[in-house]
């Protein structure tokens, strides 16, 4: 019996097994430009709305508030603030990590949105903690969000 010929849903069959699902996420125009700026210039960029003035990180092509086209890009700086965080003790495969990893949503001053990334050079984190992006050396960058190695705490 093939699935195309089943007319009674109670006749459908199932099977247990493992199915490979390889995929690629395409970044689009704004995402590609954003990562290229990180790779080539070690800059975190935002897109500014010409109508309502909102700056978006990561950048978008259109304002989600007023739908204006976003063509002005600006450097939002390397420093931000921990908005929220979590401490991971297991990896994506469910295996215990040797050392817990801190991940945080980093917000930048005057910006809508932010970046989720690792916190490094500390085992302490708190909401409101000031942090700064640490970029990989230029020769190691690949136009990936991981070109930012991590965010480190900064003194006030």
Can you annotate each of these PLM segments?
Residues 1-44, 149, 156:
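A broadly conserved sequence feature marking short terminus-proximal activation segments
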Residues 43-46, 60:
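Residues immediately within or flanking Cys/His clusters that coordinate Zn2+
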Residues 53, 67:
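Cys/His-coordinated zinc-binding microdomains
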Residues 57, 70-72:
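Short functional micro-motifs and their immediate structural scaffolds
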Residues 85-90, 138:
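Short, conserved beta-turn/loop elements at beta-strand boundaries and strand-helix junctions
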Residues 91-105, 145-148:
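Short aromatic-glycine-enriched beta-strand elements
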Residues 120-133:
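Short nucleic-acid-contacting surface segments enriched for D/E, G, S/T with interspersed K/R
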Residues 136-156:
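OB-fold/S1-family single-stranded nucleic acid-binding modules
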């Amino acid at each position: 019996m093939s699935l195309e010929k089943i007319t009674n849903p109670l006749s459908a069959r199932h099977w247990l097994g493992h199915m490979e699902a390889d995929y690629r996420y395409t970044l689009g125009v704004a995402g590609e430009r954003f990562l290229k700026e990180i790779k080539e210039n070690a800059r975190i960029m935002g897109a500014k709305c010409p109508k309502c003035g909102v700056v978006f990180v990561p950048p978008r092509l259109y304002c989600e508030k007023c739908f204006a086209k976003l063509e002005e890009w600006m450097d939002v700086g390397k420093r931000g603030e921990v908005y929220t965080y979590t401490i991971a003790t297991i990896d994506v495969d469910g295996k215990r990590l040797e050392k817990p990893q801190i991940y945080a949503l980093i917000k930048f001053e005057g910006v809508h949105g932010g970046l989720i990334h690792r916190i490094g050079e500390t085992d302490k984190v708190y909401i409101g903690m000031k942090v700064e992006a640490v970029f990989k050396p230029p020769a190691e960058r690949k136009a990936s969000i991981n070109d930012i190695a991590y965010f480190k705490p900064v003194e006030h």
